[in-house]
Protein backbone atom coordinates (compact mmCIF):
# COMPACT_ATOMS: atom_id res chain seq x y z
CA UNK A 1 0.00 0.00 0.00
CA UNK A 2 1.28 3.47 -0.88
CA UNK A 3 1.27 5.80 2.10
CA UNK A 4 -0.71 9.03 1.63
CA UNK A 5 -0.10 12.49 3.08
CA UNK A 6 -1.69 12.04 6.51
CA UNK A 7 -0.09 8.61 6.94
CA UNK A 8 3.32 10.03 6.04
CA UNK A 9 2.97 12.90 8.52
CA UNK A 10 1.80 10.44 11.22
CA UNK A 11 4.69 8.00 10.69
CA UNK A 12 7.20 10.85 10.70
CA UNK A 13 5.69 12.34 13.87
CA UNK A 14 5.92 8.92 15.57
CA UNK A 15 9.50 8.40 14.38
CA UNK A 16 8.73 5.37 12.19
CA UNK A 17 10.06 7.22 9.15
CA UNK A 18 12.85 9.69 9.81
CA UNK A 19 13.67 12.53 7.44
CA UNK A 20 16.27 15.12 8.39
CA UNK A 21 15.78 17.96 7.72
CA UNK A 22 12.02 17.53 7.45
CA UNK A 23 9.86 20.26 5.93
CA UNK A 24 6.11 19.53 6.27
CA UNK A 25 5.46 21.73 3.22
CA UNK A 26 7.16 19.07 1.06
CA UNK A 27 4.52 16.41 1.85
CA UNK A 28 2.47 15.73 -1.29
CA UNK A 29 -0.73 13.64 -1.59
CA UNK A 30 1.23 10.39 -2.23
CA UNK A 31 4.88 11.29 -1.72
CA UNK A 32 7.40 13.60 -0.07
CA UNK A 33 9.51 15.93 -2.16
CA UNK A 34 13.25 15.64 -1.64
CA UNK A 35 15.81 18.32 -2.30
CA UNK A 36 19.17 18.31 -3.99
CA UNK A 37 22.20 18.40 -1.72
CA UNK A 38 25.43 20.22 -2.53
CA UNK A 39 27.84 17.33 -3.22
CA UNK A 40 28.44 16.32 -6.86
CA UNK A 41 30.73 13.58 -8.24
CA UNK A 42 31.39 12.69 -11.88
CA UNK A 43 33.81 10.83 -14.12
CA UNK A 44 36.15 12.95 -16.21
CA UNK A 45 36.02 12.05 -19.91
CA UNK A 46 38.51 9.36 -20.82
CA UNK A 47 39.05 6.03 -22.50
CA UNK A 48 39.80 3.87 -19.46
CA UNK A 49 37.17 1.18 -19.13
CA UNK A 50 35.37 1.12 -15.79
CA UNK A 51 35.30 -2.47 -14.57
CA UNK A 52 32.66 -2.76 -11.82
CA UNK A 53 34.73 -5.51 -10.12
CA UNK A 54 37.89 -3.37 -10.05
CA UNK A 55 37.84 -0.66 -7.38
CA UNK A 56 40.78 1.13 -9.00
CA UNK A 57 38.92 1.74 -12.25
CA UNK A 58 35.72 2.67 -10.38
CA UNK A 59 37.49 5.32 -8.32
CA UNK A 60 40.00 6.71 -10.85
CA UNK A 61 39.26 9.69 -13.05
CA UNK A 62 36.67 10.94 -10.59
CA UNK A 63 36.08 14.61 -9.95
CA UNK A 64 33.83 16.16 -7.36
CA UNK A 65 32.87 19.33 -5.58
CA UNK A 66 30.57 20.90 -3.06
CA UNK A 67 28.64 23.75 -4.67
CA UNK A 68 25.48 25.83 -4.45
CA UNK A 69 24.64 24.93 -8.05
CA UNK A 70 25.84 22.58 -10.77
CA UNK A 71 25.61 23.05 -14.54
CA UNK A 72 24.72 19.62 -15.90
CA UNK A 73 26.09 19.46 -19.44
CA UNK A 74 24.34 17.68 -22.34
CA UNK A 75 25.01 13.95 -22.03
CA UNK A 76 26.73 14.35 -18.67
CA UNK A 77 26.26 11.85 -15.87
CA UNK A 78 26.76 12.98 -12.29
CA UNK A 79 26.18 11.49 -8.87
CA UNK A 80 24.61 13.87 -6.38
CA UNK A 81 23.26 13.60 -2.87
CA UNK A 82 19.89 14.44 -1.44
CA UNK A 83 19.77 17.17 1.17
CA UNK A 84 17.66 14.87 3.31
CA UNK A 85 18.88 11.84 5.19
CA UNK A 86 16.21 9.22 5.70
CA UNK A 87 15.74 6.20 7.92
CA UNK A 88 13.22 3.49 7.11
CA UNK A 89 11.85 0.85 9.49
CA UNK A 90 11.79 -2.85 8.61
CA UNK A 91 8.27 -2.68 7.14
CA UNK A 92 8.44 0.35 4.83
CA UNK A 93 10.25 0.64 1.49
CA UNK A 94 10.51 3.65 -0.80
CA UNK A 95 11.09 4.49 -4.42
CA UNK A 96 12.56 7.69 -5.74
CA UNK A 97 11.02 9.39 -8.74
CA UNK A 98 11.97 12.56 -10.57
CA UNK A 99 9.84 15.68 -10.53
CA UNK A 100 8.01 16.11 -13.82
CA UNK A 101 9.04 19.78 -14.13
CA UNK A 102 12.71 18.77 -13.84
CA UNK A 103 12.24 15.87 -16.30
CA UNK A 104 10.76 18.32 -18.81
CA UNK A 105 14.11 20.10 -18.79
CA UNK A 106 15.80 16.82 -19.81
CA UNK A 107 17.19 15.89 -16.40
CA UNK A 108 16.81 12.30 -15.22
CA UNK A 109 17.13 11.70 -11.50
CA UNK A 110 18.05 8.04 -11.40
CA UNK A 111 19.20 5.52 -13.96
CA UNK A 112 17.99 2.28 -12.38
CA UNK A 113 18.76 2.71 -8.69
CA UNK A 114 15.35 3.97 -7.59
CA UNK A 115 14.63 1.36 -4.92
CA UNK A 116 15.24 2.01 -1.21
CA UNK A 117 15.10 -1.08 1.01
CA UNK A 118 13.44 -1.42 4.39
CA UNK A 119 16.03 -0.58 7.03
CA UNK A 120 17.97 1.90 4.86
CA UNK A 121 19.58 4.89 6.61
CA UNK A 122 21.42 7.78 5.01
CA UNK A 123 21.27 10.28 2.22
CA UNK A 124 20.26 9.01 -1.20
CA UNK A 125 22.75 9.07 -4.06
CA UNK A 126 21.08 10.41 -7.19
CA UNK A 127 22.24 9.14 -10.60
CA UNK A 128 21.52 12.26 -12.63
CA UNK A 129 21.94 12.77 -16.36
CA UNK A 130 21.07 15.51 -18.83
CA UNK A 131 19.47 14.29 -22.06
CA UNK A 132 18.77 17.86 -23.19
CA UNK A 133 20.84 19.45 -25.97
CA UNK A 134 21.54 22.39 -23.64
CA UNK A 135 23.13 22.61 -20.18
CA UNK A 136 20.73 22.65 -17.24
CA UNK A 137 21.59 24.34 -13.94
CA UNK A 138 20.42 22.61 -10.78
CA UNK A 139 20.61 24.19 -7.35
CA UNK A 140 21.38 22.75 -3.94
CA UNK A 141 18.18 22.91 -1.91
CA UNK A 142 15.79 22.78 -4.87
CA UNK A 143 13.06 20.10 -4.86
CA UNK A 144 14.45 17.59 -7.35
CA UNK A 145 12.47 14.40 -6.79
CA UNK A 146 9.95 12.63 -4.66
CA UNK A 147 9.93 9.61 -2.41
CA UNK A 148 6.98 7.24 -2.56
CA UNK A 149 6.63 5.04 0.53
CA UNK A 150 5.07 1.56 0.59
CA UNK A 151 4.16 -0.61 3.55
CA UNK A 152 5.27 -4.24 3.45
CA UNK A 153 5.45 -7.19 5.76
CA UNK A 154 8.36 -6.88 8.18
CA UNK A 155 11.62 -7.80 6.50
CA UNK A 156 13.40 -10.68 8.22
CA UNK A 157 16.77 -9.18 7.29
CA UNK A 158 16.35 -5.41 6.69
CA UNK A 159 19.11 -3.40 5.07
CA UNK A 160 20.48 -2.04 8.35
CA UNK A 161 20.98 -5.61 9.64
CA UNK A 162 22.80 -6.93 6.56
CA UNK A 163 26.54 -7.50 6.96
CA UNK A 164 27.09 -6.41 3.34
CA UNK A 165 24.97 -3.22 3.37
CA UNK A 166 27.36 -1.19 1.22
CA UNK A 167 25.54 2.14 1.32
CA UNK A 168 24.23 2.19 4.88
CA UNK A 169 24.72 5.56 6.60
CA UNK A 170 26.13 7.24 3.48
CA UNK A 171 26.15 11.01 3.86
CA UNK A 172 27.27 12.20 0.43
CA UNK A 173 27.14 11.20 -3.22
CA UNK A 174 28.72 7.74 -3.18
CA UNK A 175 30.47 5.94 -6.03
CA UNK A 176 29.50 2.38 -6.93
CA UNK A 177 30.70 -0.29 -4.52
CA UNK A 178 29.87 -3.13 -6.89
CA UNK A 179 33.49 -4.30 -6.57
CA UNK A 180 32.59 -5.51 -3.05
CA UNK A 181 30.37 -8.21 -4.61
CA UNK A 182 31.71 -11.65 -5.40
CA UNK A 183 32.62 -12.21 -9.01
UniProtKB/Swiss-Prot annotation:
GO molecular function: dCTP deaminase (dUMP-forming) activity; dCTP deaminase activity; nucleotide binding
Residue positions of the active site: 127 (proton donor/acceptor)
Metabolic or biological pathway, per its Swiss-Prot or TrEMBL entry: Pyrimidine metabolism; dUMP biosynthesis; dUMP from dCTP: step 1/1
Catalytic activity annotation: dCTP + 2 H2O = dUMP + NH4(+) + diphosphate
Pfam families in alphabetical order: DCD
Known function: Bifunctional enzyme that catalyzes both the deamination of dCTP to dUTP and the hydrolysis of dUTP to dUMP without releasing the toxic dUTP intermediate.
Protein name: dCTP deaminase, dUMP-forming
Organism name: Methanoregula boonei (strain DSM 21154 / JCM 14090 / 6A8)
Amino acid sequence: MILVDWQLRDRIARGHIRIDPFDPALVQPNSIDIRLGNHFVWYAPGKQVIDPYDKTTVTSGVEGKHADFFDLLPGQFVLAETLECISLPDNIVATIEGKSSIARLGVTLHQTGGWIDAGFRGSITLEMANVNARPVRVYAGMPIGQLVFYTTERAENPYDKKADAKYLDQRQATLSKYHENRK
